[in-house]
């Protein structure tokens, strides 16, 4: 049986990653999902990609034989994007906008959000698409969670 876990290396000091990977492998974990909420770490400013931490996380996990399910970070647009495109935030039925800060803080009908999703996903695919440890991709996360499907 193959068993997977979610892991958020961006939330932990790098000094913990190797020990976490060792424990996962020791417990029989085979797959680790990472990345789905890390857009602000991958692209802290528009068009400025920072991959070193993700490169290191993938290599650290792969060194223990763990396979990677790489999540696109589209479930958590970064602050700079929301500031640049305020109507990217979802609106309630009464027209008031959500605040920035929770996951899924975007309107699925937003063309700007979709265009930026294509851009970050293509950048990730170029960098990690042929990586031998990346065995699957997760596109977005929890569609419909937090009542995010209605678009007003």
Language-model features: locations:
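Aromatic-lined substrate-binding rim segments of carbohydrate-active enzymes
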Residues: 18-98, 122-125
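Structural preference for beta-strand elements that scaffold enzyme active sites
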Residues: 2-4, 31, 67-69, 133-138
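Active-site region of glycoside hydrolase catalytic domains
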Residues: 59, 63-65, 77-152
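An acidic-aromatic substrate-binding cleft motif
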Residues: 1-16, 22-23, 27-30
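The substrate-binding groove and active-site-proximal loops of carbohydrate-active enzymes
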Residues: 3-14, 35-53, 99-118, 125, ...
